[in-house]
Amino acid sequence: MSLSTEATAKIVSEFGRDANDTGSTEVQVALLTAQINHLQGHFAEHKKDHHSRRGLLRMVSQRRKLLDYLKRKDVARYTRLIERLGLRR
């Protein structure tokens, strides 16, 4: 399930360089994180929905690849993003 337009715009404005910055790595990771968090609630209710679980695993994998890329290119931006999203404990 995708996010609403308002939720997407809020994430883009919060993590992007400007209101139209949808392609930066930080925005992509933040959008994937929001979708993953939304799907986790779905799976609490629908435990046997394996078709959607495959999509969730694909999103997690894509987020991991983007985070690896960001860590390789700019460690400072990577650590800031991880702290803002609360991905590492």
UniProtKB/Swiss-Prot annotation:
Keyword terms, alphabetized: Ribonucleoprotein, Ribosomal protein, RNA-binding, rRNA-binding
UniProt entry tagged with the keyword Kinase: no
InterPro entries (UniProt xref): Ribosomal_uS15, Ribosomal_uS15_bac-type, uS15_NS1_RNA-bd_sf
GO cellular component, one term: cytosolic small ribosomal subunit
Domain of life: Bacteria
Gene3D superfamilies: 6.10.250.3130, S15/NS1, RNA-binding (1.10.287.10)
CDD domains attached to this UniProt entry: Ribosomal_S15p_S13e
The UniProt record lists the keyword Ribonucleoprotein: yes
Annotated PROSITE patterns: RIBOSOMAL_S15 (PS00362)
Sample GO molecular function, one term: rRNA binding
SUPFAM superfamilies, sorted: S15/NS1 RNA-binding domain
GO BP annotations listed: translation
Function: One of the primary rRNA binding proteins, it binds directly to 16S rRNA where it helps nucleate assembly of the platform of the 30S subunit by binding and bridging several RNA helices of the 16S rRNA.
Similarity field: Belongs to the universal ribosomal protein uS15 family.
Subunit text: Part of the 30S ribosomal subunit. Forms a bridge to the 50S subunit in the 70S ribosome, contacting the 23S rRNA.
UniProt-listed HAMAP family: Ribosomal_uS15_B
Designated name of the protein: Small ribosomal subunit protein uS15
Organism: Escherichia coli O157:H7
Phylogenetic lineage: Bacteria, Pseudomonadati, Pseudomonadota, Gammaproteobacteria, Enterobacterales
Gene designation per UniProt: rpsO
